[in-house]
Amino acid sequence: MKIFDLHCDTASKIYKKQCDFSDKDLQVNSRYLSEFDEYFQVFAMWTDANEHRDNRKYISDMIDYFSTQIKKHPDLRYIISIEGGETLEDDVENVNYFFSKGVKIITPVWNYKNLIGVPSCVSDFGGISLFGRKVIERMNALDMAVDLSHINLQGFFECAERTAYGIA
């Protein structure tokens, strides 16, 4: 069977537990993935923006830890994503920084309004900010995908007009 999964939180769980990707308690682990003929996974790096003072550092450290774990499984095909633009703080250069660390997809908003835009669980209105537009422009320049799964309706259409690679 061939599987392409666009989202799982395993990377965040591995980092919080400081465990190996083969840990049997993980919902998605190396043993589970080895049961499929072909498997491609998008691993979301996520944190609750209210839990950490420095989301950029936290996600950066998570990517580093996860990368050491995933390298033990060279047959696995995967993409690293970031869920929640809070990690970018207020600096569009952080898009470049995370791209250099292997991130190929960013979800601009999760469940909180941030400097980029407004999630659907907060309001259907509000769209994306000027900073959000700059983030999408930079992502386009780097051929990164914009995950629109949590953004509100207005933001969805504003992003869809601007992004070269939108997914929802």
Model-derived regions: residue spans:
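N-terminal hydrophobic targeting/anchoring segments and the immediately downstream early-domain regions
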Residues: 1-125, 130
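Histidine/acidic residue-rich metal-binding segments in metalloenzymes
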Residues: 92-100, 122-168
